[in-house]
C-alpha cells in the first residue's frame, strides 16, 4: 500500500500571496494514498528539509510530493533530502505551483483550485513511480572552446592552467576576434593590442592548448563527459607546419585589389594574406575566390617566392574527430547590417561609417595609419556626428533589435574623446536617446568627454542624413530645447547594434542548446547558473549569451572555465536513470525512434525469439545505450507501435496525471 506525504511550500509570499496553501495541504491530505500533508514557509530551507526527513521516518512514507517552485530549481535538493532518510530520490515528485500557478494568476480562488489539481496529478504519478538507480559514465579529460575571441582565449587559458587539454576552434585564419580590431579600451584607454596579443601568444605556446584556426565544427554527438566532435579544417593552401609567416608571398602576390575584411573593406589586401602583423597562428592563407592559380591555373608567384615550400595548391579540407568532456560556446557577435537603415545613407555615402569602421580609421595599425581621414576624399573631417542606438532598442514596428547593445554609449564616448584629443579643432556631436554608463568608472568617463573635451551631447534623434555637395546634411531634433537641428557634417558615425554571430544558430543546433528570440544562447538560470546552458556539459562564454563589454566578457570566460574544470576534475559522472526502454516484444524494427534521437543513443540489433512449434525467429529490435540517452522522450512519441517507454515518465504515469487533472 502506498503511503504518500505531501509538503506545500509558501515560498515566502511568492506562492502564499496568491494560493491558499493551508487549504491546498488540507485538500490533498484527503487524496487516496496520502497519509500526511502539511505546509511550511520555505520547504527548501534546512528546517524544511529536516521536516521532510523526519516525516519519512515517522510515517514510513513510500513517496513524497512537494508543491513548490519549478523542479529546475530544487528537485535535486529534495531528492537528496529524501535519500538521506532512506527513500529513493526518484520517489519524489514536484508539483510546480509557483511558475505554473501563483505567478500567472491573480484570482486567489482560481490559483488555489489549480494548485490542488497540480498536486493531485503529482500524487497520482508518484504512486506509480519505481525506485531508479543512476549509473555512471567516464569523463574525457579534454575541453573544446568554439570561438577564438577574447572570451574563448581566456576560457582556454584558464582550463589549460588547471592542467587539462583544450582545443580552440576558430573559423577565421587567426584567433583574437573583434578585440584585434579595436584601438583602445574604455574606461582606461589601454591599448587593446597590448592586452590581447600576449594572451594570443600564450595560447599558441601553451602545450595544453591546440588551436584549430580557419576551422569549423562540423557535427557534435554524445553527451556530457563524452562528446564526439567532428572539426572541419578548411584548406588554407598553405602548410601550417612549414610556413614561417615571413610575408614574402603577400608582398609579391599580383592580385592586390581584394577587399580587406580586417579593415572592413576600407582598404585592400592580396589574394594570399596574413590578417594582421600579430596574427596567431602567423600563417598565410590563400583566398580561393581571388587566387588566379586556383581559379584558372595561371600564376604561382607565391609558390616561387616561398623559400619554405609551404604553398600547396592541392590542399583540401580535412575532418578531425575528437572526444571532449565539456564544450564552451564563445561564438561572439557581429555588428548589425546598417544598409537596412536608409535614413542614415550608409550605403549612399562612404563618409557614413559604422563605429567599428571608425575604430579602424583611428587605429595606428589601420588603413590610414591612425590619421582620421574621410574615406571619400582623404580630407580631415572638421565636423563629426555620432548617432547612438542604430538598430538597438527598436520596437516591433522598427527595423533592428529590441535590446540595448550595452557597449555603444561607452565606445562612442571613447571615440568622441579620442577625436577631440587628437584633433581639437574638430566639432563633435553625439545624438542619444539615453546615456547608459552602469560600469565601474563609466559615468566618470562619459563626463570627461563632456566636461573636459567639450563633446556636444544632444538628447534627440537623427531623422535623416542627406549627402549633398560634399557634405552630409544631418537633420535631427533636440528634445531638451524642443528644436530642430541641421548640421553640415563631414562624417557620420553610426553606433551599430550588436547581434550574435551568424554561426550561432547552427552551433546551438549541434549542441542541442537553447536560444532566445534574438539568437543569443540561453543560460540554464539567469541568476544561479549564468554560464551554463540547459544542455549538460555545454557552457557559455562572452557575447554569445548577450551583449557585454570586455571586462564582463573576461569575467564570464573565467567563470565558464571554472565550471569546465569542476566537471573535468571528476573521473565519472552520474547518468540520468530516466532513460528510454524498448519493449522488444512490441518493437517492429521500423527505425522511427533511431531517426528522431538527437543523441544517437538508439541502435538496432538482430535478436533471436522463440516462435511457435519450437522455431527460432530473428527479429530486428531497438536497443538503447543508457549512458548516451538523455531521457528527452522524443523516441516514445515517434514510436508507432508504442514499444518505447521512458523510465520515470511512462505512458501509464502520464495518463494517471491526466486522469487526475480531469477528475
List PLM regions with ranges.
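Residues forming the flavin
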Residues: 1-663
Amino acid at each position: 500500500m502506498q503511503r504518500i506525504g505531501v509538503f506545500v511550500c509558501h515560498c515566502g509570499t511568492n506562492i502564499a500571496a496568491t494560493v491558499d496553501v493551508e487549504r491546498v495541504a488540507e485538500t490533498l491530505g484527503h487524496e487516496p494514498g496520502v497519509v500526511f500533508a502539511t505546509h511550511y514557509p520555505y520547504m527548501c530551507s534546512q528546517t524544511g528539509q529536516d521536516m521532510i526527513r523526519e516525516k519519512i521516518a515517522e510515517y514510513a512514507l513510500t513517496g513524497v510530493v512537494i508543491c513548490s517552485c519549478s523542479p529546475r530549481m530544487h528537485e535535486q535538493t529534495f531528492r537528496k533530502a529524501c535519500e538521506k532518510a532512506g527513500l529513493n530520490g526518484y520517489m519524489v515528485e514536484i508539483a510546480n505551483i509557483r511558475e505554473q500557478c501563483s505567478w500567472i494568476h491573480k484570482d486567489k480562488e482560481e490559483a488555489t483550485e489549480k494548485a490542488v489539481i497540480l498536486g493531485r496529478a503529482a500524487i497520482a504519478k508518484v504512486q506509480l513511480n519505481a525506485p531508479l538507480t543512476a549509473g555512471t559514465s567516464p569523463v574525457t579529460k579534454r575541453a573544446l572552446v568554439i570561438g577564438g575571441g577574447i572570451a574563448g582565449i581566456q576560457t582556454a587559458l584558464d582550463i589549460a592552467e588547471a592542467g587539462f587539454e583544450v582545443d580552440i576552434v576558430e573559423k577565421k585564419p587567426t584567433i583574437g576576434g573583434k578585440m584585434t580590431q579595436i584601438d583602445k579600451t574604455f574606461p582606461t584607454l589601454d591599448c587593446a593590442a597590448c592586452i590581447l596579443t600576449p594572451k594570443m601568444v600564450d595560447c599558441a605556446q601553451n602545450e595544453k592548448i591546440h588551436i584549430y584556426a580557419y576551422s569549423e565544427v562540423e557535427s557534435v554527438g554524445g553527451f556530457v563527459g563524452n562528446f564526439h566532435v567532428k572539426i572541419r579544417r578548411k584548406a588554407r593552401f598553405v602548410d601550417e607546419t612549414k610556413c614561417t609567416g615571413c610575408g614574402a608571398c603577400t608582398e609579391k602576390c599580383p592580385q592586390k585589389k581584394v577587399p580587406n575584411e580586417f579593415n572592413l573593406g576600407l582598404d585592400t589586401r592580396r589574394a594570399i594574406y596574413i590578417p594582421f602583423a600579430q596574427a596567431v597562428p602567423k600563417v598565410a592563407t590563400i583566398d580561393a575566390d581571388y587566387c588566379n592559380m586556383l581559379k584558372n591555373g595561371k600564376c604561382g608567384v607565391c609558390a616561387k617566392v616561398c623559400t619554405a615550400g609551404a604553398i600547396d595548391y592541392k590542399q583540401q579540407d580535412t575532418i578531425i574527430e575528437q572526444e571532449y568532456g565539456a564544450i564552451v560556446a564563445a561564438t561572439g557577435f557581429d555588428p548589425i547590417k546598417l544598409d537596412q537603415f536608409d535614413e542614415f545613407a550608409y550605403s549612399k555615402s562612404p563618409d557614413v561609417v559604422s563605429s567599428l569602421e571608425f575604430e579602424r580609421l583611428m587605429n595606428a595599425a589601420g588603413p590610414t595609419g591612425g590619421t582620421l581621414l574621410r574615406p571619400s576624399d582623404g580630407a580631415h573631417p572638421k565636423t563629426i556626428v555620432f548617432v547612438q542606438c542604430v538598430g538597438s532598442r527598436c520596437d516591433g514596428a522598427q527595423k533592428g533589435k529590441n535590446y540595448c547593445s550595452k557597449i555603444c554609449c561607452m565606445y562612442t564616448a571613447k571615440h568622441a574623446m579620442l577625436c577631440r584629443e587628437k584633433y581639437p579643432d574638430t566639432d563633435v556631436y553625439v545624438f542619444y536617446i539615453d546615456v547608459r554608463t552602469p560600469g565601474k568608472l563609466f559615468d566618470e568617463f562619459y563626463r570627461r568627454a563632456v566636461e573636459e573635451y567639450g563633446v556636444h551631447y544632444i538628447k534627440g534623434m537623427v531623422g535623416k542624413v542627406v549627402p549633398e555637395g560634399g557634405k552630409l546634411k544631418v537633420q535631427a531634433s533636440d528634445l531638451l530645447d524642443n528644436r530642430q537641428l541641421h548640421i553640415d557634417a563631414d562624417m557620420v558615425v553610426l553606433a551599430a547594434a550588436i547581434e550574435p554571430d551568424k554561426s550561432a544558430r547552427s552551433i546551438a543546433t549541434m549542441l542541442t542548446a537553447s536560444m532566445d528570440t534574438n539568437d543569443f544562447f540561453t543560460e540554464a538560470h539567469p541568476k544561479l547558473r549564468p554560464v551554463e546552458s540547459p544542455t549538460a556539459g555545454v557552457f557559455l562564454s562572452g557575447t554569445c549569451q548577450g551583449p557585454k563589454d570586455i571586462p564582463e566578457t573576461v569575467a564570464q570566460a573565467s567563470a565558464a572555465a571554472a565550471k569546465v574544470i569542476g566537471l573535468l576534475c571528476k573521473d565519472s559522472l552520474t547518468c540520468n536513470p530516466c532513460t528510454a526502454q524498448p519493449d522488444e516484444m512490441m518493437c517492429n524494427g521500423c527505425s522511427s525512434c533511431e531517426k528522431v534521437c538527437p543523441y544517437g543513443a538508439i541502435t538496432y540489433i538482430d535478436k533471436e525469439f522463440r516462435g511457435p512449434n519450437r522455431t527460432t525467429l530473428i527479429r530486428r529490435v531497438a536497443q538503447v545505450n543508457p549512458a548516451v540517452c538523455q531521457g528527452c522522450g522524443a523516441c516514445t512519441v515517434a514510436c508507432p507501435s508504442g514499444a518505447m517507454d521512458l523510465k520515470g515518465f511512462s505512458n501509464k504515469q502520464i495518463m494517471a496525471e491526466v486522469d487526475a487533472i480531469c477528475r
